[in-house]
Structures are given as C-alpha cells and as structure tokens.
A protein has these predicted regions:
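Charge-rich, low-complexity linker and terminal segments
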Residues: 1-8, 79-169
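A positional/architectural concept
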Residues: 1-60, 65
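Short, non-ligating residues that shape and space the ligands of small metal-coordination modules
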Residues: 70-71
C-alpha cells in the first residue's frame, strides 16, 4: 500500500480515498492475506480512518500449547488529528505534563498517512489476548502412568514414617 499525501486528499472526490486490501502485512504472520477495505476521509483538521478487514492467524493455546487457527475480524474507526506542530522538536522542555485528552494520534497536515502501518497496528490490537483453543480446554494432561507411591529419595523415609504414625493414631 502506498502512503497517502494528506493535502492530496482534499482534491479527492468527497475528500475520501478507499483502499482495497488483499496482501500480507510485514511483521504480521497470517495464514491468509489481510482482506478488506480502508477508508480515509479528510475532515479539515482531522482524518477519519475506518477499516473492515479480516485474516486467519495461527495461535498457540495458553493452556495446552496446541496450535489452532483463529479468524481476526477488524471493524474499527479512528480520528487522527492534523497538527502543524506535531514534528516540532526545538525548544522542548526536559519534562512536560500531558493531559489525558492530549493522548491522541496526530499527523502533520502536509505529511503522509501510511495505511499499511495503521492497518498493522489495528490488526495487532485485534489479536486475542487470551489464546485458548476452546473454552473447555483442560490444559496439559499428565499422561505418565505407574508413578510409585513410595518416595524414591530415602531421606524422606522418616517423614513418611511420621505421617503413617499420625494417621494410625
């Protein structure tokens, strides 16, 4: 996917660009290419970016370590503010307090928007945090049979004798 020059969006029909996606994203291991659509709309002082996409990934169950396939479905929308001072690095203080409402995605209004990077980030956010092959997954089963009842280490013999003496009383 090519980068979008943000000022060019103002000349597009309805100030919108739609990108059909059917490709493997670098850094995201999927069995199928990411398929979907990204829509980038210039709204004056912000970009409205939305996407519907899906791909199939191979996960490893956190309980039993079995591998299974999982469909990642993305249906998201994000506002990216356009700020001319976003790349200003001169005369910055050593420390700066940032309010919660300032923790927003911003781009320079004369810069570029990279849809492949944005889609990669959104797909990573959509990955399941708890990876379970099924809700009833029992975990790793102990299949070792014939474990002796008596401890192998003779140093535990006195403890076993004490336990037997207590249980007899």
């Amino acid at each position: 996917m090519d980068a979008i020059f943000i000022p060019q969006l103002t000349k597009a029909p309805e100030r919108t660009e739609e990108i059909q996606v059917e490709e493997f994203l670098p850094g995201l291991e999927t069995l199928t290419p990411v398929r979907g659509i990204i829509q980038v709309k210039h709204q004056g002082n912000y970009l409205e970016v939305s996407s519907q996409a899906e791909a199939i990934i191979t996960c490893t169950c956190n309980r039993c370590l079995q591998q299974y396939n999982h469909r990642v479905v993305l249906n998201t929308q994000e506002v990216i503010w356009l700020d001319a001072n976003v790349n200003q690095t001169e005369d910055l203080p050593l420390e700066r307090e940032v309010a919660v409402e300032d923790l927003l995605e911003t781009l320079a209004p004369d810069g570029y928007f990279y849809p492949s990077e944005w889609l990669y980030e959104q797909m990573c956010l959509a990955l399941p945090q708890r990876q379970l092959c099924s809700l009833n997954c029992p975990g790793i089963l102990n299949t070792v049979q014939g474990i002796p009842e008596e401890p192998i280490d003779s140093r535990w013999a006195s403890l076993a004798a004490l336990k037997k003496q207590i249980s007899d009383n």
